[in-house]
Amino acid sequence: MIRTETIEEFETHIEEGELTVIHFITRPNIVNYTIGWWVNVIGSIFIRPCGTKDKLGLVLAHNIPVAPAKYYFKNAHEQLHFTLFFPALPKGTTHIDIVEEEGSNRIGLYNFYRVPMSKINSGVPLQRH
C-alpha cells in the first residue's frame, strides 16, 4: 500500500502510473431531498478489471468521508466532487467494475459495472444521483 501524508504526495505516484484515479460527482435526489441527506464511501470499495476476480482496494478517498463518517449536504442542489485512488490496474485493462458492495441493490451505493477505461482516463467524473 502507498502511504503518504498529503494529497500532493500522491501526484508522484499518479505520474508514475502507480495509482488509478477515479473522479466522481454526487448530489442529493432533488425529489426526495430532506435535511440531513448525507454521503460517504465504504472503506472496502474496490475496482476490478472486467472478467477477473482481482480486487484492488481503496488507497485514498479525497473530499469524501469513509464510513462511518458522513458528509451532510447543505441543500438539495449542492454537488460533491470527490476522487478515489486505487492501485494501478494491469496493463491492457479496457473496462473495470467499481464495487462498493458486491451483489447489493441497495440504493446509494457506488456500484458501476463495465466502465470503459477511456472514460476513467478522460477525467470526466462518474455521476450517481
What are these regions (language model features)?
Residues E16, P49-D54, P87-T94:
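A short, structured loop/turn motif at beta-sheet edges
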Residues V59-D97, G103:
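Short, solvent-exposed, Trp/other aromatic-anchored flexible loops in extracytoplasmic proteins
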